[in-house]
Each structure stands twice: as C-alpha cells, then as structure tokens.
C-alpha cells in the first residue's frame, strides 16, 4: 500500500496505526465521497481489487448482504478467471445465497445450503484474493436498516478476512 494512501487513512481515522476498518465522518457528503474516490483510485493504482458498495442503492432491501454478495462474487469471479472450478463455485454461491436468507426453509435444508454457500464462498475468495488483494468500501450504510452494518461486517470478516 502506498504511503500516500496510508497517510490519508491515518488522517481520516485519527490513529497512529490504521485499523482494518476506517470510517469517514465530518465534512459534507461530497467531501467524503471525493475522499473515498481518491483513496479507491490510489488503491487500484497499486494493484488492489476495490469493490465500491453503496448501500443507498439497496435501501429497499431488508438485508444488504445479498446485494453485497452479488457484487463480491462478480469481482472475485473476474479476478479468479473463468474456468470450470470458478464457474462451479459461482453457481453454488448464486444458488444458495438467496435460499439461506429465506425464512421458509426447514432447518435441515437451511444447514445444507449454508454449508454449500460457506464452502463455495471461502474457496472462491481464497482463489481470487491470492492473485489480487481485495478492499471493500461501504457508503450510505448510515441510512440502511438498523443492524445492517454489523451484518455486513460479520459477513466480510467471515469470508474475506
């Protein structure tokens, strides 16, 4: 990571060592967006994979994890390459993701689908992230349903960390 990016993150977070999670507060929405865009461009310039997730686009969703999963899978798929293994993993993720968010499944079926999703997502992330590290930026999360940030943070730490 370039020192300019690190300096920006340190100044935004106000800490000596930047945490794995940095939140931008203060300033106008435009100023925060400009800072995030600048940081994203710097991250891309040094060869990192950047996913820009704007929660405002999905405010009608009760759970933001599914749109985030779709964005992450699209990015990881492109980074991992299009081969048989990648396609199989993506198909398993796409098949199981909406199902595990459903509340109408029996617990046995739900456990099976969670295992399928968990296994496929971790394998796809491992293949992709070895080739090109991944950074996810979240915007507009303050307007989402209460608890959305915690769910997204847990999801990212479970599969991408």
Task: For each feature predicted by the language model, list its residue ranges.
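Glycine-/small-residue-rich active-site loops that bind phosphorylated ligands and cofactors
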Residues: 31, 59-60, 143-144
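P-loop NTPase nucleotide-binding core
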Residues: 20-22, 34-131
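N-terminal pre-Walker A segment at the start of P-loop NTPase domains
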Residues: 1-13
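P-loop (Walker A) phosphate-binding loop of NTP-binding proteins
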Residues: 27-28
């Amino acid at each position: 990571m370039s020192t300019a990016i690190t300096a920006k993150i340190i100044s935004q977070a106000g800490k000596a060592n930047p945490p794995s999670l940095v939140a931008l507060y203060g300033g106008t929405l435009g100023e925060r967006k400009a800072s995030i865009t600048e940081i994203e461009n710097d991250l891309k310039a040094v060869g990192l994979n950047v996913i820009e997730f704007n929660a405002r686009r999905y405010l009608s969703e009760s759970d933001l994890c599914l749109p985030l999963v779709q964005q992450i899978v699209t990015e990881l798929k492109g980074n991992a390459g299009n081969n048989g293994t990648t396609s199989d993993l993506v198909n398993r993720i796409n098949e199981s993701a909406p199902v595990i968010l459903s509340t109408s499944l029996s617990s046995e079926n739900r456990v099976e689908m969670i295992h399928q999703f968990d296994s496929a997502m971790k394998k796809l992330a491992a293949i992709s992230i070895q080739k090109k590290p991944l950074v996810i930026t979240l915007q507009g999360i303050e307007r989402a349903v209460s608890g959305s940030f915690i769910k997204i943070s847990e999801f990212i730490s479970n599969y991408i960390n």
